[in-house]
Design a protein with these regions (language model features):
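Short, acidic/polar
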Residues: 40-52, 111-127, 175-179
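Active-site groove signature of glycoside hydrolases
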Residues: 124-145
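Short acidic capping loops at alpha-helix termini that bridge into adjacent secondary structure
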Residues: 26-27, 61, 87-92, 130-134, ...
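Conserved beta-strand positions
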Residues: 30, 62, 96, 134-137, ...
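Beta/alpha (TIM)-barrel catalytic core signal, keyed to glycine-rich beta->alpha loops juxtaposed to Asp/Glu
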Residues: 2-12, 141-329, 341-344
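N-terminal small/glycine-rich loop or linker at the start of catalytic domains
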Residues: 19-37, 95-108, 131, 136
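N-terminal binding-site loop/beta-alpha segment at the start of enzyme catalytic domains
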Residues: 1-92, 158
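Alpha-helix N-cap and loop-to-helix initiation/capping positions
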Residues: 40-44, 72, 76, 107-115, ...
């Protein structure tokens, strides 16, 4: 049966301007980091993407290494584009990234022009696209001049492979340098993608959040649910099909008794707001307008629907924020800290 998206999809979502650019992103975007590799049935992937678009989620975020195996998420999304979204390409924002290991040898990762351009070409081929809307440097490369990496992004945009350039997990200092280089080249940095959630607030400590506001660069926060910790999933133990059980970027050692007790308190605050814990966690990331979009992952369509519902209440009282701060102790869950380091 031919897929027909919900007619009221744009009424279900809030759209925010990405920095000072003309690009608007949905307040909730869908990331394909997990659950889009060979370990997930194709029909499940299609159902997740359909549910997202039906709820006004127009932004689909990928990277060359997403899988497993690396590249398989882009292959899967390319099939879904052809099967379900072929007539809606101009309604979609598709992004990809390059920075992590993809092939053997010295040119298979990091930030050289050689790797960045080849990676973009491979991503386009896997997805069957002429261009992506956003292409990112996935991580800072301490061994490649920043001018070279940003020059590669400039070339990728100027050659028509991407419409916008972005960076991911760069700290405040490196972000200022990267943005200045891109501005000089005439291809502005439109967006930054850092990890950010109640339990991982490095963007506040580092000053990155303020830096992005000062520079007029948009932001999309990945892991707003702390890899699933900020949901009800782990309140009663570790489910067999969960990330923690499978050691997928969340480890059982992170879920101590004290951590789970605090998450239960956060869940009570969410219930008082008539939200699920996931919805409140997303709303918290989006509070005050400092973050353009929250980038979610999902293993089933119902999770997409739940997360999209966060836009129904993005406001917090001072009392709610104080209570959240009381129980949302920062945990050592920033797996990307090394990518954000200043030292070279």
């Amino acid at each position: 049966m031919t897929y027909v998206p919900a007619k009221d999809r744009y009424e279900r979502m809030v759209y925010r301007r990405c920095g000072r650019s003309g690009l608007k992103l949905p307040a909730v975007s869908l990331g394909l980091w997990h659950n889009f590799g060979h370990d997930t049935p194709h029909d499940t992937k299609r159902a997740i993407c359909r549910a997202a678009f039906d709820h006004g989620i127009t932004h689909f975020d990928l990277a060359n290494n997403y899988g497993p195996p690396p590249g398989s998420a882009e292959h899967a999304f390319g099939s879904i584009l052809a099967e379900d979204f072929a007539g809606y390409r101009d309604e979609l924002i598709v992004s990809s990234k390059a920075g992590y290991g993809m092939w053997p040898g010295p040119y298979g990762e990091w930030g050289s022009r050689k790797y960045m351009v080849a990676s973009c070409d491979q991503s386009l081929k896997r997805m069957g696209l002429d261009y992506v809307d956003i292409f990112y440097s996935h991580r800072f490369d301490p061994d490649t001049p920043l001018e070279e990496t940003m020059g590669a992004l400039d070339y990728i945009v100027r050659s028509g492979r991407a419409l916008y350039a972005g960076i991911s997990s760069y700290n405040s200092e490196r972000t200022r340098e990267a943005v200045a280089i891109l501005n000089d080249l005439g291809t502005p940095c439109v967006i930054h993608q850092p990890s950010y959630n109640m339990l991982n607030r490095w963007v506040e400590r580092d000053g990155l959040k303020e830096t992005l506001s000062d520079l007029g660069v948009g932001s999309i926060a990945f892991t707003p649910l702390a890899q699933g910790m900020l949901t009800k999933k782990y309140l009663g133990g570790i489910p067999d099909d969960s990330r923690a059980a499978q050691d997928k970027s969340l480890f059982p050692s992170m879920l101590t008794e004290d951590v789970v007790a605090n998450i239960r308190k956060l869940n009570e605050i969410a219930e008082g707001r008539d939200q699920t814990l996931a919805q409140m966690a997303i709303a918290w990331v989006l509070r005050g307008g400092g973050i353009t979009s929250a980038l979610i992952g999902a293993s089933k369509p119902s999770q997409v629907e739940d997360c999209a519902g966060a836009v129904g209440n993005l406001d917090f009282t001072d009392e709610e924020l104080a209570l959240i701060d009381q129980y949302a102790d920062e945990e050592q869950i920033n797996l990307w800290a090394k990518s954000s380091e200043t030292d070279t």
